[in-house]
Amino acid sequence: MRSTLGTMLLAVCAFPTVIAAQNPVSNGIRALAQRQPKNIVDAAEEMPADKYGYKPTPAQMSFGKVVVHLILEGNYELCSAASGQKAPDPGKFEETDSKDKLVTGLKASFKFCETAFAQLQDAQLADSTPFFGGHKVTRGFAALVTVADWADHYSQMAIYLRLNGLLPPTAKKA
């Protein structure tokens, strides 16, 4: 009886490790994807509402446009491509919408990504998925593009904050 109980306890304790070992690549992608959404949302909350129209040069996107891009293309479309899950209809977003509407939309889009990435399995990463411009890519490629896109746009938002005399979230002391 003692031996059986010990074996069962060992199996229960080891089970999470076995499960994690079955998806090392998708677990790595999920780990990368956990940090950036918070930084991006914090940056969106940090920028004053009256600065959402700010852009460093006429050719660049406004801060509000960056947020809209993240909501629509950067999150719903990319996370859908990476996971194979159909994205919900996000509704309409314009760069001139209120800060509150844009931040709420941004949070909702990241929630979809969190749910989509939670389902991602290594066995699916080589599956083909539709991508921008009618191209086909692998789900793994789409997942990596998503995480890279978040890093790119967070750095963009951080620069916009600094140009307006504000510290980006990752530059603040805890």
How would you name each of these model-derived features?
Residues G6-T17:
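Bacterial N-terminal signal peptides
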Residues I19-A21:
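Boundary at the C-terminal end of the N-terminal hydrophobic targeting segment
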Residues V25-I29:
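Disorder-to-helix initiation segments
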Residues R30-V41, K51-G91, P130-A174:
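Short, contiguous alpha-helical
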Residues P48-Y52, A82, A118, D122-L125:
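Short, flexible helix-adjacent loops and helix caps
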